[in-house]
Amino acid sequence: FSEKQQLVFGSFLTKEYSVESAALFNPSIVEHPVQSGLAAGETRFVLSLRSVGEGHISSVGFMEGVIDGAHHIHFTHQGPWRTPGVKSISNGGDDDHYNITFGDDIPLPERVIFPQSKSESMGIEDLRLVKFSDHGETKYLGTYTAYDGKRILSKMLETTEFQHFNIRKLKGSEIDNKGIAFFPRKINGQYVVSARQGGEKLTIMRSEDYMTWNHKEPLQQPNRGFELVQIGNCGSPIETPEGWLMITHHVGPMRRYTLGVTLLDLDEPHKVISVLDKPLMEPLESEREGYVPNVLYTCGWMQHGDSILIPYAMSDVACGFALLNTEEILERLLNNKK
């Protein structure tokens, strides 16, 4: 068949789908695996975004960019099209254990991870990415909530270059939660995550193999006015000499979402050193109207020099960036130490 004939045949078998037509929100950010060709003080990053299209189906899209020493952000150009990866089953036919591969000709900003199994048929929600290092090896882990329209399932993707992805479901008696976020390295020889339990409080969990989670320890529970509905993490912690900085979300009256920060012990992360006594960020008047109103939310942040870059969603209709001075936030936390 000629190329024109192939295009005609293909048009009858193709449906156009706009992955971002309803909402674009809940970003996560990590250092890009390629840091070559940059000027001093620059960091290249990967930004993931939750995209919602027709039928309220959530998928994962990507952007990439560079933040320079003056904190200016420059994004890589992206075209108008998004291309899903090619799926292959990798665990004896288990629909929840599969691989996704993108061709070399598809740039990262044009790749989309669309639901590929029954358990996530209605969406891949709130990917929390982390750059994970162990014995000199680096990989990227991302936890997300799979949704089939009735039930949720905690799943994880793993990649080294954002071209080939291995996707699996997490296991264990304590894993049926939302908002699971890995710490960026092992602690005392174990993998560690924070997670929301019971729909309202934060816990710490440990695992030997990073797939099976059977034990939890309490971390934080809502007890202040601006968080009485629930509290949860907003991505993986950042390591500092004073402890782990963990960004959190707090839900209060009128289901108003604000962001906060908690400082955890480096060696015993179930121990809280300090929490901010009031929200770090809250919706501005210009940010409160949207698909889900009165909400600020993020799924991760990134260290850049002496600052922390926070991508955040405003009421599920747009995303922006905030910059946090690491020394200043640590000083506030240590002055408010328990």
Feature annotation, model-predicted:
Residues 302:
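Glycine-rich phosphate/diphosphate-binding loops that line cofactor/substrate pockets in enzymes
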Residues 1-124, 130-181, 185-229, 239-291, ...:
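Beta-rich carbohydrate-recognition and catalytic domains
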Residues 232:
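Catalytic core of Fe(II)/2-oxoglutarate
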Residues 291-298:
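C-terminal structured domain segments
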